[in-house]
């Protein structure tokens, strides 16, 4: 009997385009999920594929959606909402109507339990900070809750609770996949902008970049703590990367780079030539774009049973 396979899709705002390339590489190999768990933009991408057949054509359709997205479609400026939010009369700075329309257009099932592929969404209780796995109930509201970046979008009301972005509590919910019985987990992180020449200038860009650094650190810890409980395959996000999570202008580049990297990496995994042992927080000492690729994934030959992995030094970025 085949292993139960999960796809876990992390948050990352505009860097969610990276997951489109990764998904294409997976579906090209006919690697299909038995269940999908998503957080934030990963919930949007996950809900899209959970609505449709597990085919390359589905990913082509998702790519077309992403190519049509712009910053102002997701984060539309509204001076009045921003003013009221800044002075405490609203709990958010950006109207949610555009995001709600986007979610409604891409999720083709009304309730989570009606998805073609079992689909679960992670959100955060705005009051307690606890993480919630939403497995039943209104599907579009669940995705909207998971993507409700705190302070930017309003919380989503769900069964008497105010829910915000799942990335606050658990951006890459590997543990939930294992709890649901997954034996093989494909993890689709969006990565971080590791190759910037200077910190982001805008407030929203700085917020999203800082959150990406924070959640990456949690991911490293979670992979280390769970690696013996399931087969974890972490697809490598593009690196070096100098695209901020608020930049929708380089979607095509992100999709293509992610597809190329994921396809090559899966080839190595299929041949037993690569074992992902973890990631590292890093940046690049060279100027942006100064290297073709910095690989934060230490790759070693497969380790024989009972052996200890080598801890050889990798490239320092």
Residues covered by each model-derived region:
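Short secondary-structure transition/capping segments
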Residues: 46-49, 124, 197-201, 279
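Active-site-adjacent alpha/beta core region of enzyme catalytic domains
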Residues: 74-193, 225-276
